[in-house]
Amino acid sequence: MTLTPPKKTHLKQLEAESIHIIREVAAEFDNPVMLYSIGKDSAVMLHLAMKAFAPGKPPFPLMHVDTTWKFREMITFRDQMAEKLGMKLLVHTNQEGVEQGIGPFTHGSAKHTDVMKTQALKQALDKYGFDAAFGGARRDEEKSRAKERVYSFRDKFHRWDPKNQRPELWNLYNGKVNKGESIRVFPLSNWTELDIWQYIYLENIDIVPLYYAAERPVVERDGTLIMVDDDRMPLEPGEQPMMKMVRFRTLGCYPLTGAVESEAATLPDIIQEMLLTTTSERQGRVIDHDGAASMEQKKREGYF
């Protein structure tokens, strides 16, 4: 009698693939790090890393690039999760940008993103000498990410060249890098937004409350609902925050992240909403609407 193993579900296949990638990087590279942006994808990636090395801890730290403009709830959640899981958390901020007063309102989204995110990330990777950095990007998010490999190679200046990528056959990954070079690793490349939410529900993964619909103070700017998270946000003449039932599909710096009107206050509600939506989650990212500062150009300059 021949026993055949039970067929894995779609989510279990994705889980196994991601865990394999995480273990491969831990085995191949000398000094890896997991970028923790505090969003839903980071939450899933961290959960997978904990599974990959259970009952031990992952053999690499978490790192968050803090632009100083993240939602307050995100920072609180970040610190709570690091303490709960017993993970080492590195937090890096571009102090030169802080001293220059760089911000989304004073310098615009493109300048703010370059100085406080891209340059800050490159500073941190150089400071700690990381040769591999995990990120939670998925191919279904945005067109430039759709053509990026799981192992995304970067030169000594952290730049990505989309015309110079290595083939990835089956589940074989070439991790050879020269001195000064590094890779960005995307274990969730083949997941969709719906996969992420279904996995969060099935695995009971903690996420930032901002993903759930609630009454929040917002103003409408150029058709985008921006949450007034603190008193640094300048209001235009006659503008008053409105209390609306909103949630966020994606999270970043609060002045550059649009909310969506929603009644989805539970995970099943969010999943149902995802089954019906016809727009990308990154439609709420203000930085993606600037053609001169497209995602591909940002990645060429060192953005994740």
From Swiss-Prot:
One Pfam family here: PAPS_reduct
Gene3D superfamilies: HUPs
Pathway where it operates: Sulfur metabolism; hydrogen sulfide biosynthesis; sulfite from sulfate: step 1/3
Disulfide bridge positions per record: none
GO biological processes: hydrogen sulfide biosynthetic process; sulfate assimilation
Claim: rRNA processing is one of the keywords in the record: no
Transmembrane feature ranges: none
EC assignment: 2.7.7.4
Keywords noted in UniProt: ATP-binding, Nucleotide-binding, Nucleotidyltransferase, Transferase
Substrates-to-products reaction catalysed: sulfate + ATP + H(+) = adenosine 5'-phosphosulfate + diphosphate
Molecular functions per Gene Ontology: ATP binding; sulfate adenylyltransferase (ATP) activity
Class in the EC hierarchy, top level: transferase
Lineage: superkingdom: Bacteria
Function recorded in the entry: With CysN forms the ATP sulfurylase (ATPS) that catalyzes the adenylation of sulfate producing adenosine 5'-phosphosulfate (APS) and diphosphate, the first enzymatic step in sulfur assimilation pathway. APS synthesis involves the formation of a high-energy phosphoric-sulfuric acid anhydride bond driven by GTP hydrolysis by CysN coupled to ATP hydrolysis by CysD.
Family classification: Belongs to the PAPS reductase family. CysD subfamily.
HAMAP family in the cross-refs: Sulf_adenylyltr_sub2
Assembly, per entry: Heterodimer composed of CysD, the smaller subunit, and CysN.
Stated name of the protein: Sulfate adenylyltransferase subunit 2 1
Organism whose genome encodes this protein: Marinobacter nauticus (strain ATCC 700491 / DSM 11845 / VT8) (Marinobacter aquaeolei)
Protein's gene: cysD1
